[in-house]
């Protein structure tokens, strides 16, 4: 391997250097080609991987399980009811138990401190599958997707994230672009901007990489000439209806619709979303949002944009598999 990432955890977007991040992208590309050509070699035979999900998931779980299967590893899945972590057993104690049984641990939950504690005490690589602060495995897939759909070098790609920018996706897209020297636009109402903690991290990385960074409340300014527009959901299950009402009112000007796509001035602009997306009324929650708030053509993205040729969210979802596989092979592979 060109880089030695063996036994390294991935807890935040900035854990790896730009060169290491690009190495993962190249490895993911090679593994994707091998899977399509049916020439893939197993590098994880006999490895045991534990997946801890305090928050449910479709893409992250499936990507880890298929990646492990393709590479010859075994998987144990612990769902929200299948683990005592944080309830009857501390993160520290859980780490010291699982680290003796498994070669690596993935954790998806709320607390960034939790995944960091696992990594500190497990003695094996730990991967952040999502916390309230960061979504680092998603970032590898997002940059891979942007590279696949652009003929520009990574550092010349322009993208905007529009919506609630204080979210894990907002933090992560802010930081990954600054890490890799990209043209990054972060756009949302000022009250939902990333905190100073994340801005400081981004600015340090920006100075090192030469990234261009714009944080603005103006969606048209943010999307001008971009190659990609990213967004994410505005609301989450379990939140009070009052919170939904206020946030939807605040974020409605930041909906990704045809007008915003045209405002880029670039007919080749692609739409990206980590999914799931509330773009129609074919889900229980989508129907509820339409009935309660009159948003029957989608919430954070309209259905016509989501169903258009501009949408690369499903390629983005597939790339979760290839990039997570690259992470596993790079950190555990023989």
UniProtKB/Swiss-Prot annotation:
Record key words, sorted: Arginine metabolism, Cytoplasm, Transferase
Main location as per UniProt: cytoplasm
GO molecular-function term, one example from the UniProt record: ornithine carbamoyltransferase activity
GO biological process, one term: citrulline biosynthetic process
Residue positions binding L-ornithine: 168, 232, 236-237
Pfam families xrefs: OTCace (PF00185), OTCace_N (PF02729)
Record: residues binding carbamoyl phosphate: 57-60, 84, 108, 135-138, 274-275, 320
Family matches, as NCBIfam families: orni_carb_tr, PRK01713.1
Name this polypeptide is given: Ornithine carbamoyltransferase, catabolic
Organism for this UniProt entry: Rhizobium etli
Gene designation: arcB
């Amino acid at each position: 391997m060109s880089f030695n990432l063996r036994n390294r955890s991935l807890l935040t977007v900035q854990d790896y250097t730009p060169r290491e991040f690009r190495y993962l992208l190249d490895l993911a590309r090679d593994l994707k080609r091998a899977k399509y050509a049916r020439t893939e070699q197993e590098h994880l035979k006999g490895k045991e991987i534990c997946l801890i999900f305090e928050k449910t998931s479709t893409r992250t779980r499936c990507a880890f399980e298929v990646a492990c299967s393709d590479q010859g590893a075994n998987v144990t899945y612990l769902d929200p009811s299948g683990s005592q972590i944080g309830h009857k057993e501390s993160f520290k104690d859980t780490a010291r138990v699982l680290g003796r049984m498994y070669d690596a641990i993935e954790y998806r939950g709320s607390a960034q401190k939790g995944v960091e504690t696992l990594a500190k005490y497990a003695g094996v690589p730990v991967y952040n599958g999502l916390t309230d602060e960061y979504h680092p495995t998603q970032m590898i897939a997002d940059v891979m997707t942007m590279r696949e759909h652009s003929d520009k070098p990574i550092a010349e790609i322009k993208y905007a994230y529009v919506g609630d920018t204080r979210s894990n996706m907002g933090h992560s897209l802010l930081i990954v672009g600054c890490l890799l020297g990209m043209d990054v636009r972060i756009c949302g109402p000022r009250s939902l901007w990333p905190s100073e903690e994340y801005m400081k991290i981004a600015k340090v990385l920006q100075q090192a990489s030469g990234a261009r960074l714009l944080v603005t409340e103006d969606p048209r300014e943010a999307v001008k000439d971009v190659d990609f527009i990213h967004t994410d959901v505005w609301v989450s299950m379990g939140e009070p209806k009052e919170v939904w009402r206020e946030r939807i009112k605040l974020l409605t000007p930041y909906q990704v619709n045809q007008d915003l796509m045209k405002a880029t001035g670039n007919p080749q602009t692609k739409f990206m979303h980590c999914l799931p997306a509330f773009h129609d009324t074919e889900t229980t929650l989508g129907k509820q949002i339409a009935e309660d708030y009159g948003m029957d053509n989608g919430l954070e993205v309209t259905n016509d944009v989501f169903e258009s040729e501009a949408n690369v969210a499903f390629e983005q979802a597939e790339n979760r598999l290839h990039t997570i596989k690259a992470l596993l092979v790079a950190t555990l592979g023989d």
